[in-house]
Design a protein with these regions (language model features):
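Structural preference for solvent-exposed beta-strand-turn elements
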Residues: 1-239
């Protein structure tokens, strides 16, 4: 049996630079679709999923300008499509965040069922439950198509049957431009949920309670641009 032997007694010291949190970045970048203006996002981690999201946003019509290795400007005022290509969307698990962002901003979205890092079966039923509660009609197949009745989602009370980080973030994105107030009960509490809420609030959203099991989102008419720095990755810091 292989083993590691660790001899202690040597205090650690010094400094390291920690990358931006991956799980925050892969939600915040598609959340830029909700912004009616230019948003500058800093402390971007250098991972393939981020590069793919840049390509997807560009394909949808957004203007994506990479400023340096860790900063980007995204302008989604020129988005002309709510249907990212099958080949790109299915390559990353986090592509489901495009559903909440596009549905919230444009009232409809068609996104391929995601693949990517597949740690067993991770259904999106809680995402769909939240969208339907807010008045969306959702059909599922190789693609998930969601459309808001009347073109805009309505605030609703959403109780999560199981705690889901992805669903909490997706419903939060869908709700920021909805008509009325949305509450998410039994919400996930991870740091990247708080970071997404802070990003959206910095752009003009009204989200309270992120980081607790009850999140309240009061819908606003529009989000405007701004600058935001993604939190450091706690997993990288701990390892």
């Amino acid at each position: 049996m292989n083993k590691y032997i660790i001899h202690g007694g040597r205090p650690l010291f010094g400094e390291v630079t920690i990358s931006g949190a991956k799980n925050a970045a892969v939600a915040i970048i598609p959340a830029a679709l909700l912004v009616d203006g230019v948003c500058r996002i800093e402390n971007i981690p250098q991972i393939s999923d981020v590069t793919l999201f840049f390509s997807i946003l560009d394909e949808l019509g957004a203007r994506v300008r990479v400023l340096n290795q860790h900063a980007v400007e995204i302008d989604c005022r020129t988005v002309r499509s709510t249907h990212p290509s099958y080949d790109m969307a299915r390559r990353i698990r986090a592509s489901y965040y495009l559903l909440g962002a596009l549905l919230g901003r444009f009232g409809e979205a068609t996104v391929a069922m995601p693949g990517g890092c597949n740690f067993g079966v991770r259904p999106i039923d809680q995402h769909v439950k939240g969208f339907r509660a807010m008045g969306a009609e959702v059909t599922e197949g190789n693609f998930v198509h969601a459309a808001a009745r009347g073109g805009r989602l309505a605030g609703a009370n959403v109780y999560m049957d199981v705690v889901s980080v992805g669903a909490t973030m997706n419903i939060m994105m869908a709700a920021v431009l909805a008509d009325g107030t949305t509450t998410i009960e039994n919400a996930a509490k991870e740091p990247h949920i708080v970071d997404l809420a802070n990003f959206l609030n910095s752009m003009g959203a009204d989200i309270k309670g992120a980081g607790t099991d009850s999140i309240r989102i009061k819908g606003v008419e529009r989000l405007s641009g701004g600058t935001y720095c993604i939190i450091p990755d706690q997993i990288e810091a701990g390892t």
